Curated annotation (Swiss-Prot):
This is Uncharacterized amino-acid permease PB2B2.01. The lineage of its organism: Eukaryota, Fungi, Dikarya, Ascomycota, Taphrinomycotina. GO terms for molecular function: amino acid transmembrane transporter activity. Residues 1-34 are annotated as: Disordered. It is a multi-pass membrane protein. It is found in: Endoplasmic reticulum; Membrane. It comes from Schizosaccharomyces pombe (strain 972 / ATCC 24843). Keywords: Amino-acid transport, Endoplasmic reticulum, Membrane, Transmembrane, Transmembrane helix, Transport. Pfam families: AA_permease (PF00324). It comes from the Eukaryota. Its main location: endoplasmic reticulum. Residues 111-121, 181-193, 243-271, 335-361, 429-436, 508-511 are extracellular.
Length: 585
């Protein structure tokens, strides 16, 4: 009688003591896991090591695309936990620096003026800060596929989860090819080569990144986010030098706050509301870090650090950078709206006005990297959103198919097919087409943020109602549930401001077409919610029947020990400095 002990390299046949032997005949066994049904022969009384069948790199690559047979993990549904803490931190930072701040800030500055930009971005920044903390607590407690759309389904309402999921997916279907067309506009800064060629290059590049699965996405995002962070810090330093008159080629001398004080509040209350909504859309993408929960090696360790850095990211990369640029470019500058693409970026205009020749081209390259990074992040988040549709029963089961490397194949294929919409850049009216397509899900980010806050509020209420302790959770928001109430109210105010500006646009008359372009997604998501509610007759989720057990990640003994050390005040100076560093950067 033999006992088989497996490891990754071989199968060992270990005999029992001689007195238990019955015969010396060879025994045969089939190990289907490691040998694909090949017979492993071992003789009683002997120990034989059978080397595992080695695969070359090419065969291993091909086999990686085979469908994962065992996808019973309810949390990940076949997704692989291969993202490290450094990936999560840089994904969070990368989501904060995109075209919204580089280029989109031009419209904000023109509509509302420097003071409105500063005030509105501070207000919306606090809203995002509170939302990310709520998301971090939910992601650590339930590190499941779908992240906040799954949380909305479980803690708010199944029909709302259905409507939110599809609205979120629609946004990626449109914005990814839109990012590709934006990238072609960046390249036109250097050459007028056919835009369709560059769309093809971008599609091939994104395909190449995603061949390597979630780890490839994480590494590429880490590299591109690092470049964006360095570039933003470099501009802040350069902006201070320009404002102080330290650039030899700039003959304007010291400027101080003179430009900032001119037209500080443009278009009065209407301008303030317009910037309020623009600021909210500029922060879109900060929720992507929550999507990665099901593919993070240690969510309980990675997410608290990434969440605590949110305040630092908002303060430096948005508030400080926009304050610096508003010292250099007036909100009344006609170039902010008469120019297009990167030429309208206040960051580029500030460098051009200082007569620094090479830097505008370098900054354009940085913005191009931001566009590619944004498309890469949206492809990742969008494919996981489509995958979660199938997992939650909101779409065909084929949407859940994942290969051995953890790639959601069908979800990625769907998004790659819609990328071909990027070739609309060859038509004359492509921007009009995208505007109407984007209107279907234009408010999706706000609905997501509001759902995160509401899900957190109801989750906390259910924990209290079911007599569950927050000590079971690996990470808890230090602001309790009050921060989620604050953020939820602000989301409602942003939606109201967008409604007001859509009816009474800045610098124009009321227009039905403009209104539906900006606000069509609100009635669309309500129609999805009502139709699903009526057809499936879903029941209301009460605090008593809310599921707090499935996929719940209990705090580990190691985390409990660390918590006890903190409460006992036994942290060393080195540990305290590390904690302060984690909170700030």
């Amino acid at each position: 009688m033999n006992a088989y002990v497996r490891d990754s390299e071989s199968v060992y046949s270990e005999s029992y003591p001689p007195e238990n032997f019955i015969s010396n005949e060879p025994e045969k066994s089939k190990d289907k896991d490691n040998f694909n049904g090949e017979e492993v022969i071992s003789y009683v009384g002997e120990v034989e090591t059978v080397p595992a069948k080695e695969e070359n790199v090419f065969r291993r690559f091909i086999n990686g695309f085979k469908i994962e047979k065992n996808q019973q993990d309810s949390a990940g549904q076949g997704l692989k936990r291969r993202l490290k803490s450094r990936h999560i931190q840089m994904i969070g930072i990368g989501g904060a620096i995109g075209t919204g701040v580089w280029v989109g800030s031009s419209k904000s500055l023109y509509r509302g003026g420097a003071a409105s930009v500063l005030i509105d971005y501070c207000i919306v920044g606090t809203m995002v800060f509170c939302t990310v903390y709520a998301l971090g607590e939910l992601a650590v407690a339930f590190p499941t596929r779908g992240s906040f759309v799954t949380h909305a389904t479980r803690f708010i309402d199944e029909s709302w989860g259905f409507a939110l999921s599809w609205n979120y997916v629609f946004s990626f279907i449109v914005t990814i090819p839109l990012e590709l067309t934006t990238g072609t506009m960046m390249i036109k800064y250097w050459t007028n080569l056919n835009s369709g060629i560059w769309v093809t290059v971008f599609i091939v590049f994104l395909f190449f990144i995603n061949i390597f699965g979630v780890k490839g996405y994480g590494e590429m995002e880490f590299i591109m986010s690092t470049i964006k962070v360095v570039a933003m810090c470099g501009f802040i330093i350069l902006g201070i030098i320009i404002d102080c008159g330290g650039v030899p080629t700039d003959h304007r001398g010291y400027m101080g706050t003179h430009i900032f004080r001119e037209n500080a509040f443009r278009h009065k209350f209407k301008g303030f509301c317009a910037v309020f909504t623009s600021a909210a859309f500029s922060f879109s993408g900060t929720e992507y870090v929550g999507v990665a929960a099901a593919e993070t090696e240690n969510p309980a360790k990675a997410f608290p650090v990434a969440v605590r850095q949110t305040l630092f990211r908002i303060a430096i990369f948005y508030i400080l950078s926009l304050f610096i640029v508003s010292l250099l470019i007036s909100g009344a500058d006609p170039r902010l709206t008469s120019y297009h693409g990167v030429d309208a970026s206040p960051f580029v205009l500030a460098i051009k006005d200082a007569n620094i020749k090479a830097l505008p081209s370098i900054l354009n390259a940085i913005i191009l990297i931001s566009v590619i990074s944004s498309a890469n992040a949206q492809l990742y988040a969008g494919s996981r959103a489509i995958h979660s549709l199938g997992c939650n029963g909101f779409a065909p089961k084929c949407f859940t198919l994942v290969d051995r490397e953890g790639r959601p194949l069908v979800a990625l294929l769907i998004l790659f097919l819609f990328m071909f919409l990027g070739y609309l850049v060859e038509t004359g009216q492509y921007d009009t087409v995208f505007d109407w397509m984007l209107s279907i899900s234009g408010l999706g980010t706000l609905f997501c943020w509001g759902s995160i806050c509401l899900a957190h509020i109801r989750y906390r209420a259910a924990m209290k109602h079911q007599n569950r302790s927050l000590k079971e959770v690996g990470f808890v928001s230090p602001f309790n549930v009050y921060a989620s109430y604050y953020a939820f109210i602000l989301v409602c105010l942003v939606l109201a401001a967008e409604f007001y500006v859509s009816i009474f646009p800045v610098g124009g008359k009321p227009d039905a077409s403009a209104f539906f372009e900006n606000y069509l997604s609100a009635p669309v998501i309500l129609v999805f919610f009502i139709c699903h509610k009526l057809y499936y007759k879903t029941k209301r989720i009460t605090l008593s029947n809310m599921d707090l057990e499935t996929d719940f990640a209990y705090k580990t003994p190691v985390e409990e020990e660390e918590e006890e050390e903190k409460s006992a005040g036994s942290l060393s100076i080195k540990q305290r400095m590390k904690k302060l560093s984690d909170m700030m950067c």
